[in-house]
UniProtKB/Swiss-Prot annotation:
Species lineage: Bacteria, Pseudomonadati, Pseudomonadota, Alphaproteobacteria, Hyphomicrobiales
Subunit structure: Homodimer.
This protein's pathway: Pyrimidine metabolism; dTTP biosynthesis
EC number: 2.1.1.45
Subcellular location: Cytoplasm
Active site feature: C180
GO cellular component, one term: cytosol
Binding-site residues, dUMP: R26, R160, R161, R209, S210, C211, D212, N220, H250, I251, Y252
Protein name per Swiss-Prot or TrEMBL: Thymidylate synthase
Gene name linked to the record: thyA
Binding residue positions for (6R)-5,10-methylene-5,6,7,8-tetrahydrofolate: D212, A306
GO biological process terms, semicolon-separated: dTMP biosynthetic process; dTTP biosynthetic process; methylation
Annotated InterPro entries: Thymidate_synth/dCMP_Mease, Thymidate_synth/dCMP_Mease_dom, Thymidate_synth/dCMP_Mease_sf, Thymidylate_synthase, Thymidylate_synthase_AS
CDD domains noted in UniProt: TS_Pyrimidine_HMase (cd00351)
Family to which the UniProt record says this protein belongs: Belongs to the thymidylate synthase family. Bacterial-type ThyA subfamily.
Length: 307
């Protein structure tokens, strides 16, 4: 019997519980960490790797990916969609700069109500979307990495250079949080020879330099699989495999009880993903375009984000 692919994730957390290197990290919370991990997910039959041993709010993950693809770096448009996963960083910066003990709810309300306030305090700096869609080189030329990769997939699918990344050394200091999922590389297999009609198969490998396994990784895996499905649709290819590689993989010390609870649960079948329409470009997808069926996870497990 084939082992459920979610065990790759569960086994990694169990390994860190037993063998992780205990350290005090940037956040002050403390972690059990290790270096180097890999997970592989075969998506060729329409599966979406949304983990099932706790509920993952997949729509939030997809909305974040769609936001990245717009090139936006301000949390205002996320908040308009009821996505609050980036609020902690600008909120912490505002409290530190002003000394005001504002609540998250009041801060978000001001971001939504006051465009000038949002422009000053809601921007995250040149984070993912800026680098993916508007990377500025030393000569001042702006590069749309996503558009370039899609063009390569259409016209030179055997290339080994179909990569985009967000680790812009010259702009790291201005980012609210340097990129964790850094490098995305596409690979095309099953390429037809002249005269053949078979469909190519598109796979994606992601390198993530730093990974909060309990809270962050379930979102990352889900949204990266969705990105693969979107790009495959745009370039008329079948979906292949998602390969995820982690650098510093860690679990936070304040998540240990929650992780033990999750490890006590048995994985359930992954749901399926269907794209309900084919937009004209990668820029035109909306959350309504994604249908996830047969997702029946265990209950959610709450935990605090380390900022």
């Amino acid at each position: 019997m084939v082992r459920h692919p979610e065990y790759q994730y569960l086994d990694l957390m169990a390994h860190l519980l037993e063998n992780g290197d205990r350290r005090i990290d940037r956040t002050g919370v403390g972690t059990l960490s290790g270096l180097g991990a890999m997970m592989r997910f075969d998506l060729s039959k329409g599966q979406l790797p949304v983990f099932t041993t706790k509920r993952v709010y997949w729509k939030l993950a997809v909305k974040e990916m769609l936001w990245f693809l717009t090139g936006d770096t301000n949390i205002r448009n996320l908040l308009k969609q009821n996505v609050r996963i980036w609020t902690d960083w600008p909120l912490a910066a505002y409290r530190k700069a002003t000394g005001e003990a504002i609540s998250q709810e009041d801060f978000e309300a001001r971001i939504l109500a006051d465009e000038a306030f949002a422009e000053t305090w809601g921007d995250l700096g040149p984070v993912y979307g800026k680098q993916w869609r508007q990377w500025r080189d030393a000569d001042g030329q702006v590069h749309d990495q996503i558009a370039t990769v899609i063009d390569q997939l259409r016209h030179n699918p055997s290339s080994r250079r179909m990569i985009f990344h967000a680790w812009n050394v010259g702009e790291l200091a201005g980012m609210a949080l340097p990129p964790c999922h850094m490098v995305y590389q596409f690979h095309v297999s099953n390429l037809p020879s002249p005269g053949e009609t078979k469909r190519p198969r598109l796979s994606l490998m992601v390198y993530q330099r730093s990974c909060d396994l309990f809270l962050g990784n379930p979102f990352n895996i889900c949204q990266q699989a969705v990105l693969l499905a979107m790009v495959a649709q745009q370039v008329d290819m079948d979906v292949g495999e998602l390969v995820w590689a982690g650098g510093d993989v860690h679990i936070y010390l304040n998540h240990l009880d929650a992780i033990r609870e999750q490890l006590s649960r048995e994985p359930r079948p992954f749901p399926t993903l269907r794209l309900l329409r084919r937009p004209d470009s990668i820029d035109d997808y909306r959350i309504e375009d994604f249908e996830v069926s047969d997702y029946e996870p265990h209950a959610a497990i709450a935990a605090e984000v380390a900022v």
